[in-house]
């Protein structure tokens, strides 16, 4: 595991909230309870403890035990909010974190290389894997009829492309 993989991005500090040093954070995790009071997180790779939390739509306002004023809070503006990879929740079999899939090689059933997953779009009906495909992109629906196998150890996603998918 590389140093970058040892830390998982869960948010980004958008700015300061109030004069007491609260931070407005864009939430980038499916587990918003990570921002509950009492939890620890890393901002700029330094550890902080959440003392108070309030929600504002898809953003969270956190107050940190170690930050008591606006000046100290402003220094964290724009910083990444992370957790150690060891703190990741175990997912059910067949369910993956986005960071585990991004960068995987996509091949068809015959072993022909299609590209590499660059992004994952979370849609209401199913996720879509955005893969490089020559000079274009392929939008691969993450459904059982198309995605036949995901093998993290081999770094590979095997698909059975539906007609028109790669045109």
Curated annotation (Swiss-Prot):
Query: Keyword Mitochondrion on this protein?
Result: no
- Where primarily located? cytoplasm
Residues of the PRC barrel domain: 93-165
Concerning InterPro entries, the annotation shows: Leu-rich_rpt, PRC_barrel-like_sf, PRC_RimM, RimM, RimM_N, RimM_N_sf, Transl_B-barrel_sf
Q: Give GO terms for biological process.
A: ribosomal small subunit biogenesis; rRNA processing
Task: Cite a single GO MF annotation.
Answer: ribosome binding
Cellular component per GO, a single term: cytoplasm
Q: List UniProt keywords, sorted A-Z.
A: Chaperone, Cytoplasm, Ribosome biogenesis, rRNA processing
> Where does the record say this protein resides?
Cytoplasm
Protein role: An accessory protein needed during the final step in the assembly of 30S ribosomal subunit, possibly for assembly of the head region. Essential for efficient processing of 16S rRNA. May be needed both before and after RbfA during the maturation of 16S rRNA. It has affinity for free ribosomal 30S subunits but not for 70S ribosomes.
Entry-linked HAMAP family: Ribosome_mat_RimM
| Membership in a protein family | Belongs to the RimM family.
- Protein name from the UniProt record: Ribosome maturation factor RimM
**What organism is listed for this UniProt entry?**
Dehalococcoides mccartyi (strain ATCC BAA-2266 / KCTC 15142 / 195)
Gene name as annotated: rimM
């Amino acid at each position: 595991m590389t140093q970058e993989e040892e830390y998982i991005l869960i948010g980004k500090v958008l700015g300061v909230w109030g004069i007491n040093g609260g931070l407005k954070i864009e939430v980038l995790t499916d587990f918003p309870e990570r921002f509950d009071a009492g939890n620890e997180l890393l901002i700029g790779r330094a550890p902080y403890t959440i003392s108070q939390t309030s929600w504002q739509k898809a953003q969270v306002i956190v107050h940190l035990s170690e930050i008591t004023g606006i000046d100290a809070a402003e220094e964290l503006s724009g910083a990444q909010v992370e957790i150690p990879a060891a703190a990741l929740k175990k997912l059910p079999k067949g369910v993956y974190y986005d960071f585990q899939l991004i960068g995987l090689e996509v091949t068809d059933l015959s072993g022909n290389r299609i590209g590499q997953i660059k992004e994952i779009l979370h849609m209401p009906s199913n996720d879509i894997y955005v893969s490089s495909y020559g000079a274009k992109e392929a939008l691969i629906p993450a459904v059982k009829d198309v995605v036949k196998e995901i093998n993290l150890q081999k770094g590979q996603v095997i698909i059975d492309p539906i007609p028109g998918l790669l045109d």
